[in-house]
Amino acid sequence: MDIAIHHPWIRRPFFPFHSPSRLFDQFFGEHLLESDLFSTATSLSPFYLRPPSFLRAPSWIDTGLSEMRMEKDRFSVNLDVKHFSPEELKVKVLGDVIEVHGKHEERQDEHGFISREFHRKYRIPADVDPLTITSSLSSDGVLTVNGPRKQASGPERTIPITREEKPAVTAAPKK
């Protein structure tokens, strides 16, 4: 039986991409999926790439999702903070930035001991007064930070368009 031996000094066509470390395929900061713990026939292929996170199973919802919305009458930020109690969260306004900070010390869960900390910053839109920003925490662990948008001053009016007979662009004189 013949055994193929690959010498390290021989470069193959896709050399950096055959590496078992899969550096380009790592999703840094994301939790592991169950499928990541088991090798499959496709993951053993040197050309296999893990699908992008937006195409994977909806377990990404469980990762501290943040959403910022600009509606007609208000600005809002929704942030999943279900692993934190209200005492472990701080919301501050510094100039035109909202800072959300959450931290809990090491504690035991079903897998062992864990501690968590995060910092998020959101720019406050120009038409939102920083003094009117409020925050609330829902029973399912979603922190909502919002503020009303300033209404345009004065009533809306339509401006008529007049037609002029002379051109706006005139040709430059020839030399």
UniProtKB/Swiss-Prot annotation:
InterPro entries: A-crystallin/Hsp20_dom (IPR002068), ACD_alphaB-crystallin (IPR037882), Alpha-crystallin/HSP_16 (IPR055269), Alpha-crystallin/sHSP_animal (IPR001436), Alpha-crystallin_N (IPR003090), HSP20-like_chaperone (IPR008978). One of its GO terms (molecular function) is cytoskeletal protein binding. Zn(2+) 2 binds at residues 104, 106. Residues 142-175 are annotated as: Disordered. The modification N-acetylmethionine is found at residue 1. Zn(2+) 1 binds at residues 83, 111, 119. The keyword Acetylation applies. The modification N6-acetyllysine is found at residues 92, 166. Residues 56-164 form the sHSP domain. It is found in: Cytoplasm; Nucleus; Secreted; Lysosome. Its main location: cytoplasm. Lens as well as other tissues. Keywords: Acetylation, Chaperone, Cytoplasm, Eye lens protein, Glycoprotein, Lysosome, Metal-binding, Methylation, Nucleus, Phosphoprotein, Secreted, Zinc. The modification Phosphoserine is found at residues 19, 45, 59. GO terms for biological process: apoptotic process involved in morphogenesis; camera-type eye development; cellular response to gamma radiation; lens development in camera-type eye; microtubule polymerization or depolymerization; muscle organ development; negative regulation of amyloid fibril formation; negative regulation of apoptotic process. Transmembrane segments: none annotated. GO terms for cellular component: actin filament bundle; axon; cardiac myofibril; cell surface; contractile muscle fiber; cytoplasm; cytosol; dendritic spine. Glycans are attached at residue 170. PANTHER family: ALPHA-CRYSTALLIN B CHAIN, HEAT SHOCK PROTEIN HSP-12.2-RELATED. May contribute to the transparency and refractive index of the lens. Has chaperone-like activity, preventing aggregation of various proteins under a wide range of stress conditions. In lens epithelial cells, stabilizes the ATP6V1A protein, preventing its degradation by the proteasome. Heteromer composed of three CRYAA and one CRYAB subunits. Aggregates with homologous proteins, including the small heat shock protein HSPB1, to form large heteromeric complexes. Inter-subunit bridging via zinc ions enhances stability, which is crucial as there is no protein turn over in the lens. Interacts with HSPBAP1. Interacts with TTN/titin. Interacts with TMEM109; in the cellular response to DNA damage. Interacts with DES; binds rapidly during early stages of DES filament assembly and a reduced binding seen in the later stages. Belongs to the small heat shock protein (HSP20) family. This is Alpha-crystallin B chain. It comes from Rattus norvegicus (Rat).
